[in-house]
Amino acid sequence: MSRLLRLSLSSRVWLAAQEATRNVSEDPVVCRTPWDGSPTCTAVRVVRAEVLADGTMDLDIVFPEAAVQAVFSRTPWQDSTTATSAEEPSASTDSISSDPLPISCVESFEDMDLRCYEQLSPSPESIETIEVFPPCSTCGGHEVNGFCSLCYLRGLTDLLPQADDAGEAEVPDESAKDLCFMDLLTWAMEDKTECSRHDE
């Protein structure tokens, strides 16, 4: 079972998450979380992205159901194909109804509501086994009905507000295609904390 999450990110959080993935790849001590070292099938797959007039970005992303459980419990997650415990696979199947729930359109990342939108495959071992994501012949991203999220995100990067000191930095190939969900969640939580402090 995999989930599709629809959410909105502020451009600041989106760019910060991209920067976090660059830092993690260059410096292993940066942004250490229980999510570090998880298999690549936990990577977020962006299937739709749109920049709105107010500067926020609407995203549709797909990730394994077991990843949701790991985020909630803040514990490491092992791919069910390599896990020795029977608890992890059951977390991705037994806790979710077989009937898809309606998608939740949220106004901000901090207020996101994780819902099961559709079962993309009867019982995928990992998201990489789902055949609806053929590789893009242009960039190696993933196509959905002829739409390549990575090519589209590269085009959107130029539309997003850039920090003054980030003008010379280019988005690496993997940052748009394989953003870790825990990285996004961590940055969103920090963003919410900062907003709360300002309100006080």
UniProtKB/Swiss-Prot annotation:
Motif LXCXE motif, interaction with host RB1, residue numbers: 114-118
Keywords from UniProt, A to Z, are:
Activator, Early protein, G1/S host cell cycle checkpoint dysregulation by virus, Host-virus interaction, Inhibition of host innate immune response by virus, Inhibition of host interferon signaling pathway by virus, Inhibition of host STAT1 by virus, Interferon antiviral system evasion, Metal-binding, Modulation of host cell cycle by virus, Transcription, Transcription regulation, Viral immunoevasion, Zinc, Zinc-finger
Please state the residue ranges covered by unnamed zinc fingers: 136-151
* Presence of keyword RNA-binding: no
The coiled-coil regions, if any, are none
Origin superkingdom: Viruses
Where do the segments described as Disordered lie?
A: 78-98
Q: Which GO terms describe its molecular function?
A: zinc ion binding
Q: Name one GO biological process term.
A: symbiont-mediated suppression of host type I interferon-mediated signaling pathway
Q: Where is this motif: Nuclear localization signal?
A: 196-200
Q: What does this protein do?
A: E1A protein has both transforming and trans-activating activities. Plays a role in viral genome replication by driving entry of quiescent cells into the cell cycle. Disrupts the function of host retinoblastoma protein RB1/pRb and isoform early E1A 26 kDa protein stabilizes TP53, which are key regulators of the cell cycle. Induces the disassembly of the E2F1 transcription factors from RB1 by direct competition for the same binding site on RB1, with subsequent transcriptional activation of E2F1-regulated S-phase genes.
Assembly: Interaction with host RB1 induces the aberrant dissociation of RB1-E2F1 complex thereby disrupting RB1's activity.
UniProt-recorded name of the protein: Early E1A 21 kDa protein
